[in-house]
Amino acid sequence: MAAGSTGERPFFEIITSIRYWVIHAITLPSIFLAGFLFVSTGLAYDAFGTPRPDAYFQATESKAPVVSQRYEGKSQLDDRLQ
C-alpha cells in the first residue's frame, strides 16, 4: 500500500471491472424507469401535493389567481374554487 493511501480501490479500477457493469447495467436503467413511471402516472402529483397541469386554472379563467391578504390566502383560494 502506498504512503497516504486509504486502502480504497482506485476509481479507474472500479469502473473498468466487470462486476461494476453487471450491477449498474441493471440498477441505472431501473432507476430511470422508476422515475419515468413515477412522473408519467401522476403519482408525483399525489405524493408531493402539487396540482395537476389541468387544475391550475378554472375553465372560465385565463390568468393566475391573485391573493390580496397574506394570511388569508388559503381561504381566498378556497372561495374562488367554490
Swiss-Prot record:
This is Cytochrome b559 subunit alpha. With its partner (PsbF) binds heme. PSII binds additional chlorophylls, carotenoids and specific lipids. One of its GO terms (cellular component) is photosystem II. GO terms for molecular function: electron transfer activity; heme binding; iron ion binding. Belongs to the PsbE/PsbF family. This b-type cytochrome is tightly associated with the reaction center of photosystem II (PSII). PSII is a light-driven water:plastoquinone oxidoreductase that uses light energy to abstract electrons from H(2)O, generating O(2) and a proton gradient subsequently used for ATP formation. It consists of a core antenna complex that captures photons, and an electron transfer chain that converts photonic excitation into a charge separation. Heterodimer of an alpha subunit and a beta subunit. PSII is composed of 1 copy each of membrane proteins PsbA, PsbB, PsbC, PsbD, PsbE, PsbF, PsbH, PsbI, PsbJ, PsbK, PsbL, PsbM, PsbT, PsbX, PsbY, PsbZ, Psb30/Ycf12, peripheral proteins PsbO, CyanoQ (PsbQ), PsbU, PsbV and a large number of cofactors. It forms dimeric complexes. The gene is psbE. The chain crosses the membrane at residues 22-36. Keywords: Electron transport, Heme, Iron, Membrane, Metal-binding, Photosynthesis, Photosystem II, Thylakoid, Transmembrane, Transmembrane helix, Transport. InterPro entries: PSII_cyt_b559_asu (IPR006217), PSII_cyt_b559_asu_sf (IPR037025), PSII_cyt_b559_N (IPR013081), PSII_cytb559_asu_lum (IPR013082). One of its GO terms (biological process) is photosynthetic electron transport chain. Heme binds at residue 24. It is a single-pass membrane protein. It is found in: Cellular thylakoid membrane. Its cofactor is heme b. It holds the Pfam family Cytochrom_B559. It comes from Synechococcus sp. (strain WH7803).
